[in-house]
């Protein structure tokens, strides 16, 4: 699970309402949700985001209401995953359940607009200047869910959620 793309950097306390604002959040269609991702925070996001791009946050990324649409919008937009100092617990589980990779660690060295290569399995992020940053990857069980494409595909393929 390696992606390469542009860093879209955000600050601390980015709520699910900032990712998919309620007044625009009128559909369950993933492609329509992708169009409203960060519409008020970064209006250019939905038009410029490319497959493999990485959303980077500070502390408490995805806090707030239990809006599954926030993680779904990012995945549908083609985001390769999200790296943050910490995550809101509900966003964290929604992202895993939808198959959106996550890493945790100090995001200060990552710069908005730079191109990075992310190994979601090992937690290594390689910057264009050659610097390699190390982040905490998901544990093996959660990573298996993400690699299957989310909880539904995980259960379809494996038959249950039994942890071995």
From Swiss-Prot:
Its EC number is 4.2.1.33. It comes from the Archaea. Keywords: Amino-acid biosynthesis, Branched-chain amino acid biosynthesis, Leucine biosynthesis, Lyase. The keyword Lyase applies. GO terms for biological process: L-leucine biosynthetic process. Pathway: Amino-acid biosynthesis; L-leucine biosynthesis; L-leucine from 3-methyl-2-oxobutanoate: step 2/4. It catalyses: (2R,3S)-3-isopropylmalate = (2S)-2-isopropylmalate. Heterodimer of LeuC and LeuD. Belongs to the LeuD family. LeuD type 2 subfamily. This is 3-isopropylmalate dehydratase small subunit 2. It comes from Pyrococcus furiosus (strain ATCC 43587 / DSM 3638 / JCM 8422 / Vc1). The lineage of its organism: Archaea, Methanobacteriati, Methanobacteriota, Thermococci, Thermococcales. The gene is leuD2.
